[in-house]
Amino acid sequence: DKIHVGAYTCIGAHCVIGDGTDIGNGCDIGDGVTIGENCRLHAHVIIRERCKLGSRVTIQPGAVIGSDGFGFLMGDNGRYVGIDQVGIVELGDDVDVGANTTIDRARFGRTIVGEGTKIDNLIQLGHNVVVGKHCVIVAQSGIAGSTQVGDYATIAAQVGISGHLKIGSKSVLGAKTGVISDIPENVAYWGFPASPFKDASRQYAALKKLPALIKEVHALKRNLESPGK
């Protein structure tokens, strides 16, 4: 009576579920999963085998924790062959995960989301990503495999981050930023490729003036080629 399990939910073998946890209808909990105390899994959440959730974790409907990482090799026969993803996902205490978000299991080791981090809807975290403590990741952002995000970072909506990078603690990435290199700590970046916010703002302002500037250059060119006309 210390936990609640909704209708049509399947819980695999050797799972450990903490007191006060509420698992909604139609969830699928794989073998060997650990779920801490006072967690809330809404309807149709999938937690795949051996993944670990801390206490007071909330996961919104349709999220998938521990899906296979995206790993393939080209075989000798000219066809892609899947690489086994044998790691897990580990969510710290007080993590929130939004609806239809997917967090891939590590190829080896762990994909980690640190305590207190808040993840919005429709987020993709690739295999072996490490997100620090008390970060915020807003809707439709994606982080490719093996990237590390420091504590207290803020990632706004529709940000794309390449793999094997380091995003500094307390950094801020503006909406639609494309990140292809490391980001320092305590900075605000924006645009593509990601640049310091002031630089990116100047670039955007200059870009808006480009059509008029092109017309002016064409007019000057005509005057030089046909003076007096």
Predicted regions: what is each one?
Residues I3-P196:
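Structural signal for interior beta-strand "rungs" in well-ordered beta-sheet cores
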Residues S195-K229:
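Long, leucine- and charge-enriched amphipathic alpha-helices
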